[in-house]
Swiss-Prot record:
Pfam families: Ribosomal_S7 (PF00177). Keywords: Ribonucleoprotein, Ribosomal protein, RNA-binding, rRNA-binding, tRNA-binding. It comes from the Bacteria. The lineage of its organism: Bacteria, Bacillati, Bacillota, Clostridia, Eubacteriales. Disulfide bonds: none annotated. InterPro entries: Ribosomal_uS7, Ribosomal_uS7_bac/org-type, Ribosomal_uS7_CS, Ribosomal_uS7_dom, Ribosomal_uS7_dom_sf. This is Small ribosomal subunit protein uS7. One of the primary rRNA binding proteins, it binds directly to 16S rRNA where it nucleates assembly of the head domain of the 30S subunit. Is located at the subunit interface close to the decoding center, probably blocks exit of the E-site tRNA. GO terms for biological process: translation. CDD domains: uS7_Bacteria. PANTHER family: RIBOSOMAL PROTEIN S7 (PTHR11205).
Length: 156
């Protein structure tokens, strides 16, 4: 929390090939140790694999996958009188997108395919078809929120 007013949000520059900010955010999520060129190769390689496997525009497939993985609700712990309740809250649009991108990359890394390009492509294609680890994570998050619906009145 800054002492002097709000800090302006820094905008991400769109990526060079697709000219899309969301793809740039995906590349930033893939990046490890500041090695952006490697992250770009992985991302664009995955998009080429998606084009080969589906025959569709990889950007459309990616956007569909992202929409399928974005959570609407999540739970936040709230302490009330010595007990901690998991209170369901709505997810802000920026956080929705950030969580979806993070989950896609995390669950792509856990897959068994040979290269990261193949893993990311497979995870994106699975997410488009409402399958895969990232989609399961979204479903689990929604189930947790649904199970704790009784504590919704503790929202702040």
């Amino acid at each position: 929390m800054p002492r002097k007013g709000n800090v302006p949000k820094r905008d991400v520059l769109p990526d060079p090939i697709y000219n899309d900010k969301v793809v740039a955010k995906l590349i930033n999520n893939i990046m490890i140790d500041g090695k952006k060129s490697i992250a770009q190769k992985i991302c664009y390689g995955a998009f080429d694999i998606i084009r080969e496997k589906t025959g569709k525009d990889p950007l459309e497939v990616f956007e569909q996958a992202l929409n399928n993985v974005m959570p609407v609700l999540e739970v936040k712990p709230r302490r009330v009188g010595g007990a901690t309740y998991q209170v369901p809250v709505e997810v802000r649009p920026e956080r929705r997108q950030a969580l979806a991108l993070r989950w896609l990359v995390v669950y792509a890394r856990e897959r068994s395919e040979r290269t990261m390009k193949e893993r990311l492509a497979a995870e994106i294609i699975d997410a488009t078809n409402n399958m895969g680890g990232a989609y399961k994570k979204k479903e689990d998050t929604h189930k947790m929120a649904e199970a704790n619906k009784a504590f919704a009145h503790y929202r702040w």
